[in-house]
């Protein structure tokens, strides 16, 4: 049976990635009028160029402080050891689409509503990358996808 994922639905999703290196890969590609709640990101270091090479996760999206589009908002950077794992299980949410741009820092209810409305189709995307091209990480990300279209 197919999973219903139309307007008004909420589903749990899980994405798996193997042998990820220093190239930034999207873990979750946002869709306008969706809200994503990340439940966990599990990272395992299979191979490292050097002990202590980092694993990093960041969101590319709208900066509500600087009122700028397409900005990197860092979630975590973790130094890793070969055969070691890191579990990020602090829940956080992000909108699938960027808001209509506003001037300056978000400082009003109107600005806050613009962020929630996601009136621009520019995607906000959660990324992962390692420190070095020789690094290899396996990643599992589990999240809730709320479709408010």
Name what the model sees in each region:
Residues 49-67:
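Short, surface-exposed beta-strand/strand-loop-strand elements in extracellular ectodomains
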Residues 43-47:
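Short amphipathic, basic-aromatic surface patches that mediate peripheral association
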Residues 1-33, 48-55, 114-149:
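C-terminal interaction-tip segments
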């Amino acid at each position: 049976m197919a999973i219903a994922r139309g307007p008004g639905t909420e589903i749990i999703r899980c994405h798996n990635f193997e042998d990820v290196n220093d190239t930034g890969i999207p873990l979750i590609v946002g869709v306008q009028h969706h809200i994503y709640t990340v439940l966990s990101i599990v990272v395992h270091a299979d191979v490292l160029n050097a002990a202590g090479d980092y694993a990093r996760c960041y969101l590319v999206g709208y900066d509500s402080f600087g009122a700028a589009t397409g900005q990197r908002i860092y979630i975590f950077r973790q130094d890793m050891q070969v055969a070691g794992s890191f579990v990020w299980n602090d829940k956080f949410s992000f909108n699938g689409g960027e808001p209509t741009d506003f001037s300056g820092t978000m400082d009003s209810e109107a600005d806050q509503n613009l962020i929630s409305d996601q009136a621009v189709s520019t995607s906000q995307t959660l990324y992962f990358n390692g420190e070095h091209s020789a690094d290899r990480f396996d990643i599992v990300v589990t999240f809730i996808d709320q479709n408010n279209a």
